[in-house]
Amino acid sequence: MTDRYEQINDYIEALLKPRPDNVKRLEAYAEEHHVPIMEKAGMEVLLQILSVKQPKKILEIGTAIGYSAIRMALELPSAEIYTIERNEKRHEEAVNNIKEFQLDDRIHVFYGDALELADAVHVTAPYDVIFIDAAKGQYQNFFHLYEPMLSPDGVIITDNVLFKGLVAEDYSKIEPKRRRRLVAKIDEYNHWLMNHPDYQTAIIPVGDGLAISKKKR
């Protein structure tokens, strides 16, 4: 992440209202155990968008330990959230965390690879919001697979589309090569998304970058 980009995020995070202790405990656990969760500033923007949109049903691709799903459920008391996690340990942690927050009646966790669960997830479609926050190299595949399950006025939100600001730099020399390929994949996804014939997209440079995509009328 570039110094300037990081400074801006730090500034925004310093302005945020304190979060409940149980939420801060999740954040501390994620940091200690290197679990990727949304950056705080990006999370607040996501919640603001959801509070305006007031979705009744949300699909999240990439549960991790349940942090984002829990934050969304707390913000939207009447929303149902369906979320997918392929890592067995994180799936178990997410289920336990959701129960601790007493949200297991509204947050439903699928275990498995999102690329293989479309049929199961389709049963509870359509979704008013689809939130993509899983394997970055598969973003375009996730979009293709789940976009048909979006409600007519729904939005698709993708996290990490700026990837520490690296997509805006000359990433041809990034090492290791695996990281370079991942940055290239995200850059490719951004260009594809911005030129999608059926969606209009805005990219918001907050957190690690959010793309907000809505069907064209």
From Swiss-Prot:
Alphabetized InterPro entries for the sequence: Cation-dep_OMT (IPR050362), SAM-dependent_MTases_sf (IPR029063), SAM_O-MeTrfase (IPR002935), TrmR_methyltr (IPR043675)
Protein residues bound to Mg(2+): D133, D159, N160
GO biological process: tRNA methylation
Additional remark text: Binds magnesium, but the ion is dispensable for mo5U forming activity.
Stored CDD domains: AdoMet_MTases
Protein's name according to its UniProt entry: tRNA 5-hydroxyuridine methyltransferase
Complexes and interactors: Homodimer.
Gene3D superfamilies according to UniProt: Vaccinia Virus protein VP39
EC number: 2.1.1.-
Inactivation phenotype: Deletion mutant does not contain mo5U.
Recorded GO MF terms: magnesium ion binding; O-methyltransferase activity; tRNA (uridine) methyltransferase activity
Lineage: Bacteria, Bacillati, Bacillota, Bacilli, Bacillales
Organism expressing this protein natively: Bacillus subtilis (strain 168)
Class of the enzyme per the UniProt entry, highest EC level: transferase
Residues annotated for S-adenosyl-L-methionine binding in this entry: M38, S68, E85, D113, A114, D133
Family as reported in the entry's similarity comment: Belongs to the class I-like SAM-binding methyltransferase superfamily. Cation-dependent O-methyltransferase family.
Any Pfam family hit: Methyltransf_3
Function comment: Catalyzes the methylation of 5-hydroxyuridine (ho5U) to form 5-methoxyuridine (mo5U) at position 34 in tRNAs.
Keywords: Magnesium, Metal-binding, Methyltransferase, S-adenosyl-L-methionine, Transferase, tRNA processing
Reactions mediated catalytically: 5-hydroxyuridine(34) in tRNA + S-adenosyl-L-methionine = 5-methoxyuridine(34) in tRNA + S-adenosyl-L-homocysteine + H(+)
